[in-house]
């Protein structure tokens, strides 16, 4: 608090309130090095909020967190986003889906898409397809299509989810688009690198 220039009189009260808000009251006397990754992230958020900033900027805030801590941290960020602007730079699309009311997608330093999550996802309606195929056909189609997901089925088949302007496999059906699909549509090079 002293490094933030807070007056000593109100600092203790503000620290207590923030520790409670980020669920760290029980570990307040522990050294930061002894805390889990998620707890360290919450300490960072509490430190950033000491001066009650209007804008909070976070880079990859949930990277490396286990699923439970990730959900807890996303919920915390959503709560803080109600009172201030929270800018998040991340490649973890699910974080954005659950936190952001408004999204901007940047490529090479330029905004290439901006809207609500629902508005962005609408941009790729009728570009996400799904088709169940026999396992032995997988290799044939996996490299010809922009496959975004494979799901093994109990009957030994595979459900392909892929991106295309029109269905590429007979009997393909439209699939409900997600924000991750939009990301892969806008950044096809990400899929090429994975092949």
Identify the function of each model-found stretch.
Residues 19, 74, 121, 180-184:
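Conserved protein kinase catalytic domain
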Residues 73-161:
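ABC transporter nucleotide-binding domain
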Residues 1-107:
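ABC transporter nucleotide-binding domains
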Residues 146-195:
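C-terminal coupling/interaction segments
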Residues 26, 135, 164-166:
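Non-catalytic surface loops within mature trypsin-like serine protease
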Residues 23, 44, 125, 187-188:
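A generic structural signal for secondary-structure junctions
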Residues 2-8, 129, 188-191:
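Non-catalytic alpha-helical coupling and interface elements of nucleotide-dependent molecular machines
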């Amino acid at each position: 608090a002293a490094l933030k220039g807070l007056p000593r009189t109100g600092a203790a009260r503000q620290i207590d309130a923030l520790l409670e808000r980020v669920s760290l009251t029980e570990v307040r006397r522990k050294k930061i090095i002894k805390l889990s990754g998620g707890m360290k992230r919450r300490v960072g958020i509490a430190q950033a909020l000491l001066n009650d900033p209007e804008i909070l900027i976070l880079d990859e805030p949930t990277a490396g967190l286990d699923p439970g801590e990730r959900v807890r941290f996303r919920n915390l960020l959503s709560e803080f986003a109600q009172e201030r602007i929270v800018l998040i730079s991340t490649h973890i699309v699910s974080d954005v889906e659950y936190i952001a009311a408004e999204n901007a997608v940047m490529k090479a330093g330029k905004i290439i898409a901006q809207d609500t999550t629902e508005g962005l996802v609408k941009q790729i309606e009728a570009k996400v397809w799904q088709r169940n195929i026999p396992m032995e056909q997988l290799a044939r189609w996996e490299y010809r299509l922009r496959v975004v997901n494979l799901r093994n089925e109990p009957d030994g088949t595979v459900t392909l989810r892929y991106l295309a302007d029109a269905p590429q496999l007979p009997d393909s059906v439209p699939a409900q688009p997600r924000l991750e699909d939009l990301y892969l549509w806008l950044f096809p090079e990400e899929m090429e690198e994975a092949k």
